[in-house]
Amino acid sequence: NAPRGAPGAGHKSAIIPPHDTPLLAPMLHLFSGLDLWVGLSLVLALTFVLAFEFINGFHDTANAVATVIYTKAMPPHLAVILSGIFNFLGVLLGGVGVAYAIVHLLPVELLINVDTGRGLAMVFAMLSAAIAWNLGTWYFGIPASSSHTLIGSILGVGMANALLTDISLAEGVNWGKAIDIGLSLVVSPVAGFMVAGGILLLLKRWLPLSKMHKTPEQRRAIDAKKHPPFWNRLVLVLSAMGVSFVHGSNDGQKGIGLIMLVLIGIVPAKFVLDVNSTTYQIDRTRDAASHLSAFYHRNEATLGEFLALSRGGNGADLPKTFRCDPKLTMPTIAALQDDLRGVTNYADLSADKRIDVRRYLLCLDDTAKKVARLEGLPARERADLQRLRGDLTTTTEYAPLWVIVAVALALGIGTMVG
């Protein structure tokens, strides 16, 4: 199979974690079994990601607090502190859906081989570009979006990888996902502009004499008051904290996804799969593979040529160097079923087997996504396929609690510093 693991895997530990709290213990356990250089690489990579989130925090602070500070609805320091707290809560409670939506902009070949030198170079290139641009725009006071920056760096890495590996640019980036996210980034400000403008026009028409239309200077000159009316002030404060919370749940997840890429690249044995998965979750994954095989055979008339069902069969073998090819789907399913047969705990699998299982799952999910876009597949079957994809990835799309807390702290503290 393709190269596995990271340098230093299996060496005796040169970095011994001290005993600590239950939350920090899993984080410090990272370094057990790693030699000094691999441990330092891990520290450097994690520092890069957390630095990106820290910069993201102070870079985007103004988005949430500018209105409440300008209108005197809140004192500046209190507004920034509360914004940081709500950013922190947004990361903690936001889940990991956005995290993996961003990660899957990368081509599947890079994702299944992220534990190689090229995969690690990809992560450092993305982070270096995003950090440099965010710092530069912040320093010169240029409005910029951290999300646009990160997505642009991901697309750049995907295209560079396509050029280096002699594959077409069409395959070098997950363009379907890129278009979806790009449309969201374009539509969001337009929708915000239209909704906000519409509400303003309605309020000006229905309540033309309301105090809410006065600027802070006008209110101070006319009413000798510096704060907005109570209800307007309450709405401003709630909306600012809501923006902070949503920013945390959205932008914070990007950091979670990046940290998971780093962990999978440097210490793959511990993070390629969620080793805390329950027996039920593993059974769901194994059953999804069986149902996926049945699904493809059930729709052989539509999918037979794309998946090479007539030639592949369950008896075919995978090539020695694994690659994600739709025509190897049935052998991939067979290999996955063989690796998971009788498994009730991922910890029982060897490190190499866990890496293989992740590769198979990511490849099958990517192929299923392509199958769902084919013409001739009934809507009901597409819905079934989508559910199977969710079951396949339930133990690969996750994040440990310490990762979420670390990103939440970096983003929240960065917001307060901003």
Describe these PLM feature segments.
Residues 1-7, 11-27, 268-402:
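Low-complexity, proline/glycine-enriched hydrophobic segments characteristic of transmembrane helices
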Residues 33-34, 48, 96-138, 142-144, ...:
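Anion-binding (especially nucleotide phosphate/pyrophosphate-binding) glycine-rich loop
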Residues 39, 43-46, 50, 115-127, ...:
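Structural signature of hydrophobic alpha-helical transmembrane segments
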Residues 40, 44-55, 82-85, 238-249:
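Residue-level signal for short hydrophobic patches within transmembrane helices
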Residues 46, 50-61, 87-100, 126, ...:
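Transmembrane alpha-helical segments of multi-pass membrane transport proteins and ion-pumping complexes
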Residues 67-75, 152-164, 261-267:
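Interfacial segments of multi-pass membrane proteins
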Residues 72-84:
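Membrane-interface alpha-helices at helix entry/exit sites of multi-pass transporters
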Residues 143, 151, 155, 159, ...:
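Glycine-rich, mobile lid/loop segments that gate access to catalytic sites or pores
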